[in-house]
């Protein structure tokens, strides 16, 4: 990274307004390109997202154990780290005891280059 972001994340440092503006500009341009039919990245994949959320809901946490990052990215886009984070969160829930989960909502938002889902879990 030319902007030193990894160093700032690890060692701390200021994320300036100019840094933010550059990043925001890239995201806005990618969203415009995607909506206009361009392909800077994969569009949201609501079917895959909802299947993944249902997998978590059903407690099938090993379902993606054999998938590598490239495979997940080719299906689900750039949110591979989120897949791992959600899976880790549900594994922690399981380790803490019995729980009941629900999918509260999901919306694909192409202009944001993503789908947004909300799940909740309560220990029972």
Segments from the language model and where they lie:
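Flexible, D/E/H-enriched segments
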Residues: 2-124
């Amino acid at each position: 990274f030319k902007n030193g972001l990894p160093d700032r994340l690890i060692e701390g440092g200021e994320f300036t307004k100019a840094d933010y503006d550059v990043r925001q500009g890239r995201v806005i341009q990618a969203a415009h390109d995607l909506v206009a039919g361009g392909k800077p990245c994969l569009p949201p994949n609501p079917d895959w997202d909802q299947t993944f959320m249902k997998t978590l809901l059903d407690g099938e946490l090993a379902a993606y154990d054999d998938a590598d990052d490239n495979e997940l990215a080719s299906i689900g886009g750039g949110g591979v780290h989120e897949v791992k984070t959600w899976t880790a969160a549900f594994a922690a829930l399981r380790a803490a005891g019995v729980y009941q989960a629900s999918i509260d909502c999901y919306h694909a938002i192409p202009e944001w280059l993503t789908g947004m889902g909300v799940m909740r879990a309560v220990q029972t």
